[in-house]
From Swiss-Prot:
This is Phospholipase A2. Residues 1-7 form a propeptide. The active site is at H55, D106. It comes from the Eukaryota. It holds the Pfam family Phospholip_A2_1. Disulfide bonds join C18-C84, C34-C131, C36-C52, C51-C112, C58-C105, C68-C98, C91-C103. It catalyses: a 1,2-diacyl-sn-glycero-3-phosphocholine + H2O = a 1-acyl-sn-glycero-3-phosphocholine + a fatty acid + H(+); 1,2-ditetradecanoyl-sn-glycero-3-phosphocholine + H2O = 1-tetradecanoyl-sn-glycero-3-phosphocholine + tetradecanoate + H(+); 1,2-dihexadecanoyl-sn-glycero-3-phosphocholine + H2O = 1-hexadecanoyl-sn-glycero-3-phosphocholine + hexadecanoate + H(+); 1-hexadecanoyl-2-(9Z-octadecenoyl)-sn-glycero-3-phosphocholine + H2O = 1-hexadecanoyl-sn-glycero-3-phosphocholine + (9Z)-octadecenoate + H(+). Its cofactor is Ca(2+).
Protein backbone atom coordinates (compact mmCIF):
# COMPACT_ATOMS: atom_id res chain seq x y z
CA UNK A 1 0.00 0.00 0.00
CA UNK A 2 1.97 3.01 -1.19
CA UNK A 3 -0.60 5.76 -0.92
CA UNK A 4 -2.60 4.72 -3.96
CA UNK A 5 -6.27 5.38 -3.42
CA UNK A 6 -8.32 2.32 -4.42
CA UNK A 7 -11.08 4.60 -5.68
CA UNK A 8 -9.00 6.31 -8.36
CA UNK A 9 -7.31 3.10 -9.51
CA UNK A 10 -10.80 1.61 -9.61
CA UNK A 11 -11.85 4.43 -11.95
CA UNK A 12 -9.03 3.64 -14.37
CA UNK A 13 -10.05 -0.01 -14.14
CA UNK A 14 -13.68 0.85 -14.99
CA UNK A 15 -12.46 2.86 -17.95
CA UNK A 16 -10.49 -0.11 -19.28
CA UNK A 17 -13.56 -2.30 -18.78
CA UNK A 18 -15.48 0.22 -20.89
CA UNK A 19 -13.03 0.15 -23.82
CA UNK A 20 -12.38 -3.61 -23.43
CA UNK A 21 -15.59 -5.29 -22.20
CA UNK A 22 -14.99 -8.57 -20.32
CA UNK A 23 -11.38 -7.65 -19.54
CA UNK A 24 -9.89 -8.16 -16.07
CA UNK A 25 -7.59 -5.13 -15.86
CA UNK A 26 -5.89 -5.97 -12.54
CA UNK A 27 -5.09 -9.49 -13.61
CA UNK A 28 -4.17 -8.71 -17.19
CA UNK A 29 -2.47 -5.33 -17.20
CA UNK A 30 -0.77 -5.10 -13.83
CA UNK A 31 2.84 -6.29 -13.98
CA UNK A 32 2.92 -6.56 -17.77
CA UNK A 33 6.01 -5.63 -19.78
CA UNK A 34 8.35 -2.96 -18.41
CA UNK A 35 5.81 -0.18 -17.72
CA UNK A 36 2.40 -1.67 -16.83
CA UNK A 37 2.13 -1.66 -13.05
CA UNK A 38 4.13 0.45 -10.61
CA UNK A 39 7.30 2.07 -11.87
CA UNK A 40 8.95 1.48 -15.21
CA UNK A 41 12.31 1.52 -16.96
CA UNK A 42 14.03 0.49 -20.17
CA UNK A 43 12.41 0.06 -23.56
CA UNK A 44 8.76 -0.99 -23.83
CA UNK A 45 8.54 -4.62 -25.00
CA UNK A 46 5.46 -4.15 -27.20
CA UNK A 47 2.60 -1.84 -28.15
CA UNK A 48 0.63 -2.45 -24.95
CA UNK A 49 3.70 -1.77 -22.81
CA UNK A 50 4.24 1.46 -24.79
CA UNK A 51 0.66 2.50 -23.86
CA UNK A 52 1.69 2.15 -20.21
CA UNK A 53 4.88 4.16 -20.75
CA UNK A 54 2.85 7.01 -22.29
CA UNK A 55 0.41 6.77 -19.35
CA UNK A 56 3.30 6.96 -16.84
CA UNK A 57 4.69 10.02 -18.65
CA UNK A 58 1.25 11.61 -18.67
CA UNK A 59 1.05 11.20 -14.87
CA UNK A 60 4.52 12.73 -14.57
CA UNK A 61 3.25 15.75 -16.52
CA UNK A 62 0.15 15.93 -14.30
CA UNK A 63 2.34 16.22 -11.21
CA UNK A 64 3.98 19.30 -12.73
CA UNK A 65 0.70 21.15 -13.36
CA UNK A 66 0.03 23.97 -10.94
CA UNK A 67 -3.60 22.83 -10.66
CA UNK A 68 -2.39 19.42 -9.48
CA UNK A 69 0.02 20.65 -6.79
CA UNK A 70 -2.11 19.26 -3.98
CA UNK A 71 -1.74 15.71 -5.29
CA UNK A 72 1.19 14.93 -3.00
CA UNK A 73 3.05 13.24 -5.82
CA UNK A 74 0.38 10.72 -6.66
CA UNK A 75 -2.12 11.22 -9.49
CA UNK A 76 -3.72 7.90 -8.51
CA UNK A 77 -5.33 9.71 -5.58
CA UNK A 78 -7.28 12.12 -7.80
CA UNK A 79 -10.80 11.00 -8.60
CA UNK A 80 -12.62 12.40 -11.61
CA UNK A 81 -15.95 12.05 -13.40
CA UNK A 82 -16.40 10.15 -16.65
CA UNK A 83 -19.06 8.20 -18.48
CA UNK A 84 -19.06 5.10 -20.64
CA UNK A 85 -21.36 4.60 -23.59
CA UNK A 86 -20.80 1.39 -25.53
CA UNK A 87 -17.00 1.28 -25.59
CA UNK A 88 -16.67 5.08 -25.71
CA UNK A 89 -15.24 6.87 -22.66
CA UNK A 90 -16.05 10.55 -22.12
CA UNK A 91 -14.40 12.68 -19.43
CA UNK A 92 -16.93 15.00 -17.80
CA UNK A 93 -16.70 18.73 -18.40
CA UNK A 94 -17.41 19.11 -14.66
CA UNK A 95 -13.87 17.96 -13.84
CA UNK A 96 -11.49 20.68 -12.63
CA UNK A 97 -8.26 21.28 -14.59
CA UNK A 98 -6.28 18.65 -12.72
CA UNK A 99 -9.06 16.03 -12.80
CA UNK A 100 -9.57 16.69 -16.52
CA UNK A 101 -5.87 16.17 -17.25
CA UNK A 102 -5.69 12.89 -15.29
CA UNK A 103 -9.00 11.70 -16.74
CA UNK A 104 -7.54 12.23 -20.21
CA UNK A 105 -4.33 10.36 -19.29
CA UNK A 106 -6.48 7.40 -18.22
CA UNK A 107 -8.88 7.69 -21.16
CA UNK A 108 -6.06 7.75 -23.73
CA UNK A 109 -4.42 4.75 -22.05
CA UNK A 110 -7.71 2.78 -21.98
CA UNK A 111 -8.20 3.46 -25.71
CA UNK A 112 -4.55 2.57 -26.40
CA UNK A 113 -4.95 -0.73 -24.46
CA UNK A 114 -8.03 -1.60 -26.51
CA UNK A 115 -6.07 -1.33 -29.77
CA UNK A 116 -2.90 -3.12 -28.66
CA UNK A 117 -2.39 -6.87 -28.98
CA UNK A 118 -1.95 -8.74 -25.68
CA UNK A 119 1.12 -10.98 -25.52
CA UNK A 120 0.88 -13.38 -22.55
CA UNK A 121 4.66 -13.92 -22.61
CA UNK A 122 5.12 -10.30 -21.52
CA UNK A 123 3.05 -10.76 -18.36
CA UNK A 124 5.17 -10.99 -15.16
CA UNK A 125 8.29 -10.31 -17.18
CA UNK A 126 11.66 -10.59 -15.47
CA UNK A 127 12.01 -6.81 -15.48
CA UNK A 128 15.50 -6.85 -13.93
CA UNK A 129 16.78 -8.66 -17.02
CA UNK A 130 14.44 -7.37 -19.74
CA UNK A 131 13.96 -3.71 -18.75
CA UNK A 132 17.45 -2.61 -17.78
Amino acid sequence: ENGISPRAVWQFRSMIQCTIPNSKPYLEFNDYGCYCGLGGSGTPVDELDACCQVHDNCYTQAKELSSCRFLVDNPYTESYKFSCSGTEVTCSDKNNACEAFICNCDRNAAICFSKAPYNPENKNLDSKRKCA
